[in-house]
């Protein structure tokens, strides 16, 4: 007899369970819950500890600022809309010892989900009024079909994410039924869930078995038991990811043949020695890692990440030189013409003493016939461009290396087109100035090798950062800083988050700031750049800024990552609390690229101070104003926002981790590698991969390939 596998349980649909009619089953399917496997992997978002539930008369001053849970019955539901159209819903909830009021602000439609006479669990921070009455604001509320249900669930009651039309109580009962099925012997099955880890691995690592984990994640007897279950299930997710990425790499290597290069190390050494500056240790390490990859029979897939101004382009130049000297073409694709031109200028400088021919192809280049002929004829050289490089009429016949700058700015299909035009799969180098936390890198770029440049070139002056409030005295300081930099013939960036002010926000709009600076600095050229302008207008303004004909550029967030204006020495970020930490760091990096001492001002919204913004906003501003290391800031960003928002579907193109948390589980991530190596040595990796395909379908094509 064997235990039931997750694949077997995935074939048992929820409409076969008692109490699941067509409507309820339909609601569950909308939340991607259709099988027993889906259901047992629908993890609680929290547990209510029955031992810590308070009656109303037990809530006192010592509970203020703590989360308190109480059980009661709804005695009244009311909705009130203020003159400013703010919707306030109030529930009166009573138990045998008293009554509390719970209020929700905004369109949460609490009144449509909760009725008088229903039993509920309420969790939140209580406020005790001068009259002695107790009030909760925006608390968590859960419905229980019957108070008696609580006596059957043990000390810790699981509370599940919201599913429209299905209560937490119904989900609890369904999961109990599912676990009961799993625990019941039947024909060829013994109790339990088949474990991808052997009992030896489980024992050696002192972790829960899979069956124990699924039982205890939902219905733990203690918090410690819940933690052990969570750790095992999080570990499994990391093992699945590792399996997927190892198979991605293996599949890519087996299916694709890379270019064959012939280059002498002495040739590269001479090129590096002739550079006008000495490379940092991490630059040297990065280019050597790339050259080692280029020697392999299979194509390279490598991410080159480095902080703002760390010198990624010169590392790319060394790779370009090696590939072109072996008789191949190199394509470098940038997201905008301004950035493409900047790469053209930088690489012209780095490669000026070589015989490398550099070609430029963008939509605005008028005579493109010669470049197009060079591409189709397979003429070795560097081809720098934008989306024009992947147009239908562009056919590379001898492409050895593809370099993609700021990969997240291109769609998956666009990136693939540049690579798939060749019979031999070109090597791929992706460059990004957005440092990725080591814990997040696995889930975003797990199928790429990673090179990191984590130090700045020597002699570069650090940018001085200031955090100013929006109060009058600090506003004057901002203008004083502007005058100082303008007197030194420097240029200034002023960045705002939005074009227009809305009725619901007092945020400074770009037009308003533009008028303010225009009136204040009448002897200087102040220009406005915003997202509603055409592509050509934005490109022309950025060129004018590069040429030095603009003194102050007031802009919404359309300043390109990587834009290089050495004469810009002051960055002012208005309403800085409205920006993400990574955005703030990238914007700061637009200055400090020349010899002048540069400064960055993080300016809080007008009339506001640190005490008036959110706790998360304060953490961001304190971090950015005291730290300059992009890698450290990326780790802090992960801690503040959480993995879901950092990796997100939009960034990674995948929805992945259900229970693992990259902020806190780095130890499990490391452990997953050790365990996966054990699995490989036992030739069990195929089984793990099959489970990964079942549980992480977004990583796979319709035919099951990665």
What does each model-identified segment do?
Residues 364-383, 391-399, 535-551:
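Conserved motor-coupling elements within RecA-like helicase/translocase cores
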Residues 9-32:
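Helix-hairpin-helix
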Residues 447-511:
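Conserved interdomain linker/interface between the two RecA-like ATPase lobes of SF2 helicase motors
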Residues 232-383, 389, 517:
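ASCE P-loop NTPase motor cores of helicases and related translocases
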Residues 80-89, 94-274:
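Upstream accessory/linker segments immediately N-terminal to the RecA-like ATPase cores of bacterial MutS
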Residues 473-491, 509-706:
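C-terminal helicase module of SF1/SF2 nucleic-acid helicases/translocases
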Residues 358-370, 386-392, 499, 527-538, ...:
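Conserved helicase motor
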Residues 389-430:
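SF2 helicase catalytic motif II
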């Amino acid at each position: 007899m064997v235990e039931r596998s997750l694949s077997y349980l995935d074939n048992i649909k929820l409409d076969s369970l008692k109490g699941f009619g067509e409507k309820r089953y339909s609601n569950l399917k909308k939340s991607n819950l259709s099988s027993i496997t889906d259901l047992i992997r629908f993890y609680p978002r929290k547990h209510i500890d029955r031992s810590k539930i308070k009656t109303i008369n037990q809530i006192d001053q010592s509970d203020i600022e703590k989360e308190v849970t109480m059980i009661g019955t709804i005695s009244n539901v009311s909705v009130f809309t203020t003159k400013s159209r703010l919707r306030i819903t109030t529930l009166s909830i009573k138990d045998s010892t008293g009554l509390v009021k719970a209020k929700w602000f905004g369109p949460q439609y609490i009144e449509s989900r909760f009725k008088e006479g229903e039993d509920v669990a309420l969790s939140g921070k209580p406020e005790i009024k001068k009259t002695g009455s107790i009030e909760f604001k925006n608390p968590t509320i859960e419905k229980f079909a019957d108070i008696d249900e609580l006596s059957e669930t043990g000390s810790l009651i699981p509370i599940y994410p919201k599913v429209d039309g299905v209560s937490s109580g119904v989900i609890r009962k369904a999961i109990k039924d599912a676990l009961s099925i799993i625990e019941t012997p039947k024909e060829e099955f013994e109790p339990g869930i088949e474990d991808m880890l052997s009992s030896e691995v489980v024992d050696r690592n002192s972790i829960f078995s899979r069956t124990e984990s699924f039982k205890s994640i939902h219905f733990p007897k203690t918090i410690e038991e819940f933690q052990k279950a969570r750790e095992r299930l999080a570990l499994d997710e990391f093992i699945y990811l590792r399996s997927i990425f190892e198979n991605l790499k293996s599949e890519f290597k087996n299916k694709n043949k890379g270019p064959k290069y012939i280059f002498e190390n002495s040739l590269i050494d001479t090129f590096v020695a002739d550079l006008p500056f000495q490379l940092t240790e991490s630059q040297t390490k990065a280019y050597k890692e790339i050259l080692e990859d280029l020697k392999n029979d299979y194509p390279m897939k490598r991410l080159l990440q480095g902080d703002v101004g760390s010198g990624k382009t010169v590392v790319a130049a060394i790779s370009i030189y090696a590939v072109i000297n072996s008789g191949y073409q190199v394509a470098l694709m940038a997201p905008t013409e301004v950035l493409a031109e900047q790469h053209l200028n930088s690489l012209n400088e780095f490669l000026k003493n070589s015989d490398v021919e550099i070609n430029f192809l963008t939509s605005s280049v008028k005579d493109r016939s010669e470049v197009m002929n060079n591409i189709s004829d397979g003429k070795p050289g560097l081809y720098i461009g934008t989306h024009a490089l992947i147009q239908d009429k562009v056919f590379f016949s001898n492409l050895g290396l593809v370099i993609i700058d700021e990969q997240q700015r291109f769609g998956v299909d666009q990136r693939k087109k540049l690579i798939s035009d060749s019979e031999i799969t070109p090597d791929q180098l992706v460059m990004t100035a957005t440092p990725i936390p080591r814990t997040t890198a696995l889930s975003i770029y797990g199928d790429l090798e990673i090179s990191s440049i984590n130090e700045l070139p020597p002699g570069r002056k650090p940018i001085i950062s200031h955090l100013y409030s929006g109060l009058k005295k600090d506003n004057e300081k901002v203008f004083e800083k502007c005058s100082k930099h303008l007197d030194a013939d420097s240029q200034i960036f002023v960045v705002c988050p939005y074009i227009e002010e809305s009725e619901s926000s007092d945020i400074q709009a770009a037009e308003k700031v533009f008028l303010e600076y225009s009136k204040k600095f009448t002897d200087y050229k102040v220009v406005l750049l915003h997202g509603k302008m055409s592509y050509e207008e934005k490109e022309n303004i950025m060129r004018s800024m590069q040429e030095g004909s603009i003194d102050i550029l007031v802009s919404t967030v359309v300043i390109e990552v990587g834009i290089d204006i050495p004469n810009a020495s002051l960055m002012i970020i208005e309403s800085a609390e409205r920006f993400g930490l990574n955005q703030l760091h990238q914007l700061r990096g637009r200055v400090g690229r020349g010899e002048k001492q540069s400064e960055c001002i993080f300016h809080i919204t007008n009339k506001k101070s640190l005490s008036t913004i959110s706790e998360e906003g304060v953490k961001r501003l304190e971090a950015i104003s005291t730290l300059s290391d992009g890698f450290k800031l990326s780790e802090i960003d992960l801690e503040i926002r959480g993995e879901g928002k950092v990796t997100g579907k939009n960034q990674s193109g995948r929805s992945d981790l259900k229970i693992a948390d990259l902020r806190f589980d780095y130890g499990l991530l490391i452990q997953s590698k050790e365990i996966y190596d054990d699995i490989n040595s036992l030739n069990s990796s195929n089984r793990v991969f099959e489970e990964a395909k079942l549980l992480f379908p977004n990583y796979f094509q319709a035919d099951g390939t990665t």
